[in-house]
Amino acid sequence: MHIIAVGLNFRTAPVEIREKLSFNEQELASAMKTLSGQKSILENIIVSTCNRTEIYAVVDQLHTGRYYVKAFLAEWFGIDKEEFSPYLTIYENDGAIEHLYRVACGLDSMVIGETQILGQVRSSFLLAQEEETIGTVFNQLFKQAVTLAKKAHHETEIGANAVSVSYAAVELAKKIFGDLSSKHVLILGAGKMGQLAVQNLYGSGAKKVTVVNRTFEKAQELANRFSGEAKPFADLQHALSEADILISSTGANDYVVTKQMMSEAERTRKGRPLFMVDIAVPRDLDPELDELETVFLYDIDDLNGIVESNLQERQKAADEIEIMLEAEIVAFKSWLGTLGVVPVISALRQKALTIQAETMKSIDRKLPDLSERERKVLNKHTKSIINQLLRDPIPHAKELAGEKHAEESLELFMKIFNIEQEVALQKEKEEQLHTSITSHSVAYQS
């Protein structure tokens, strides 16, 4: 048995390739069921987002596992393997375990430490449980991965510092004003940066946001999404007189707000300070605005310094999580090692119970006049003898499973107790159970 992770992500594949191998939510369950029916695949979970598509699988052999996962991707999406194979990354066993932990913790994300991926991993895990495409191994592995990720975010500051310019602008405003709920925020520009700024503002408690854009319809569209107010570009002068915070990201070729405009707005502001953040390149806000006593101006270079500092803080937290990862990998491998001993212990118990049952039958034949009470006493004591005899071998078998040469040690253990056949029967039952679960897999879809 082996664990593999096969997939591609924003680092290894351009968006033109990623979009061709992206599962939508509606087909994910069907895809996992289909993959379960393939040769070599014992368990599987698919994690598919805008930045990655990854298949995690428990396989009976590494080479056949890799082959059938690639074949599945090619047939499901109707793409030749040669088209996407150069972009694939394949992790095996320890590498696959570590990769999953890193993904769940946000260490492999475009924005290090982001938490959205944890929700996506958890959703795929719950779906796989519901569709019965996983068993003992992945139930434990993914449960451990989700728990580790939650612990990592709780015990470190991996997600505490802003690492996008628009978010840093809002964080800077919060540091200066504290509570944003009573502040009037003016957003210049309804593009991507403006949208992110509005989203982060509302997430930080801002309640009064006005959007100004050269195309009024775009300003309305953005404002309506967040119950804000839109104003035409012609009303910018009036909007400046009302605002406490200005975040600008129009990307215009000339300054959108000049020192002269702000000087005129100051006549009605009654000395109220205005916090200005320019996240546009080229700059929207005239640098001379900083000469005004009531204006506090920051540009994208100021914010980049904050972001860079925060990235360094996140990296420190990531280094702490890497140490956590090592301990979790050891713990999971230790648990995984005990799986090999389960059929051995079951077979040993079954053989002991069979001997006890045969002994009771022999007693019944030789002592047919025993009372029911006497028979119960004998049955109880013979079972007690069996349990006492197994008290030492079973813990030792578990210890053997965790050793470096576990397979050879367990083989010797089975020979000593003469239970090779019983163990083989136990494993056969497990395989039959897996076959019954996956036999109703659905047909391929493209």
Swiss-Prot record:
It holds the Pfam family GlutR_dimer. NADP(+) binds at G189, A190, G191, K192, M193, G194. InterPro entries: 4pyrrol_synth_GluRdtase, 4pyrrol_synth_GluRdtase_dimer, 4pyrrol_synth_GluRdtase_N, GluRdtase_CS, GluRdtase_dimer_dom_sf, GluRdtase_N_sf, NAD(P)-bd_dom_sf, Shikm_DH/Glu-tRNA_Rdtase. The keyword NADP applies. The record marks H99 as: Important for activity. Its EC number is 1.2.1.70. The active site is at C50. PANTHER family: GLUTAMYL-TRNA REDUCTASE. Belongs to the glutamyl-tRNA reductase family. During catalysis, the active site Cys acts as a nucleophile attacking the alpha-carbonyl group of tRNA-bound glutamate with the formation of a thioester intermediate between enzyme and glutamate, and the concomitant release of tRNA(Glu). The thioester intermediate is finally reduced by direct hydride transfer from NADPH, to form the product GSA. Homodimer. This is Glutamyl-tRNA reductase.
